[in-house]
């Protein structure tokens, strides 16, 4: 092997070590965030089940007439619960639980953003600094957190609307409805092991820390470009059999300008929730 190839291999190894160190820090954020979101989903589900008592007029008594003490739990839907009334209850639940989601997400995203920026500076061997005082980082955190929690709650609401509709149509008792709600929120937290499905809590944690890490890297590169350094990027997959065709197509492009969209239309990973790809950057080589 020539000296030039040895040097290139050594440089690539150092870059990988630098990048890997910060990425490992980011990955260590995933588990604590997942646990916090699991707890948030459980508390949200329990609170919603309790607040359904506000619409008890939509339940008709049913079940064993000799068990009067259990009458409330055995009341069944007598007419459809109007969407506006359900939405009003859900709005109360969101308001009372928003901090359970927002704080752990905000904390993890901020750290992942910083790790991404610091890791990229190390990979590029730039003797510069990066922190959350960076204007682009501040803008990202300001816009991202509120939108994310809103998106999580909107998805939850849509899932619950389907459940409530089924309860209406099949005349479920309050007890059965409440149990189904709590069970659904439990699935949000821990998934369905029998189906080998990751939980929503895990997927959100992986996706949002990954997105923030990639954004931190991109912010550093955009700042360098603004300073007159000509940069380029390349999509990188993990290279196993689970990689989607869209990500393979992005990787096949090779090195492109940092403001050029990839074949999928994305500026950077993640292309979808749970995407395992990352963006590589370098100073553009002279022609």
Which residues does each PLM region occupy?
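Acidic, glycine-rich two-metal-ion catalytic cores of nucleic acid-processing enzymes
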Residues: 194-287
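N-terminal leader/targeting and assembly helices and adjacent pre-domain segments
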Residues: 1-191, 284-287
